[in-house]
From Swiss-Prot:
PANTHER family: URIDYLATE KINASE, URIDYLATE KINASE PUMPKIN, CHLOROPLASTIC. ATP binds at K12, L13, S14, G15, G55, R59, T162, Y168, D171. The keyword Nucleotide-binding applies. NCBIfam families: pyrH_bact. It comes from Fusobacterium nucleatum subsp. nucleatum (strain ATCC 25586 / DSM 15643 / BCRC 10681 / CIP 101130 / JCM 8532 / KCTC 2640 / LMG 13131 / VPI 4355). It catalyses: UMP + ATP = UDP + ADP. CDD domains: AAK_UMPK-PyrH-Ec (cd04254). It is an enzyme of class 2 (transferase). This is Uridylate kinase. GO terms for cellular component: cytoplasm. Signal peptide: none annotated. Belongs to the UMP kinase family. Its EC number is 2.7.4.22. Catalyzes the reversible phosphorylation of UMP to UDP.
């Protein structure tokens, strides 16, 4: 059997990615594709934990612009991530992979509370663990939650699934001459304000020397390639 380069990963999925071609909500095709790709790497023996955003349902920051109190909006966003987490859990378990959802805000009838040791035990037993409700605190993004959980779970890498094939110096959709980075340092990301993750998440990863790989998850098979050590997308590394 092939041996994975990364044996323990944190996969960060954006809520928007789950929409597919829809304007909001969850595309059954997209979530089934993610589940299939996740099963592929679990079958290789990789320990997989996941954090999903909630932007396909509600985003706290844009809610604040529409008159929703920021703290209330962020709590609404956290609940949106739990909806996405349950949907992904359902899709992964349909493929026969045992999956647990742990939330930063306790909701015992829906999911387990986040307990580090329990989460690690699930991973050791070959279960996928999905972390919902962000960090449980307003003003912190799901990117920061992903960095935090990755550090707590002692993962080898944070893998950020996006709609583009890496990190560019400017928006490749708007600017055809945008330059793609193969590798970039944490400090460059912060200094150039490259839209990878927010500054808090990048700082956490830098402090803990946790590499970040940004890749296009819309092409099936890419997640497996990343885990096997194939260089696709962009890697954020230490200086």
């Amino acid at each position: 059997m092939e041996s994975p380069f990364y044996k323990k990963i944190l996969l960060k999925l954006s809520g928007e990615a789950l929409m597919g071609d829809q304007e909001f909500g969850i595309s059954s095709d997209v979530i089934a594709s993610y589940a299939k790709q996740i099963k592929e790497i679990v079958d290789l023996g990789v320990e997989v934990s996941i954090v999903i955003g909630g932007g396909n349902i509600f985003r706290g920051l844009s809610g604040a612009a529409q008159g929703v109190d920021r703290v209330t909006g962020d709590h609404m966003g956290m609940l949106a991530t739990v909806i996405n987490s349950l949907a992904l859990q359902n899709s992964i378990e349909k493929l026969g992979v045992p999956t647990r959802v742990q939330t930063a805000i306790e909701m015992p009838k829906v999911a387990e509370p986040f307990i580090k040791r329990r989460a690690q035990r699930h991973l050791e037993k070959g279960r996928v663990v999905i972390f919902g409700a962000g960090t449980g605190n307003p003003y912190f993004t799901t990117d920061t939650a992903a960095a935090l959980r990755a550090i707590e779970m002692e993962t080898d890498v944070v893998i950020k699934a996006t709609k583009v094939d890496g990190i560019y110096d400017k928006d490749p959709v708007k600017y055809p001459d945008a330059k793609k980075y193969q590798t970039v340092t944490y400090n460059e990301v912060l200094a150039k304000d490259l839209k990878v993750m927010d500054a808090t998440a990048i700082s956490l990863c830098r402090e803990n020397k946790l590499p970040i790989i940004v890749f296009n998850s819309l092409d099936e098979g890419n997640l497996k390639k990343v885990v096997m050590g194939e260089h696709i997308g962009t890697t954020v590394v230490a200086d």
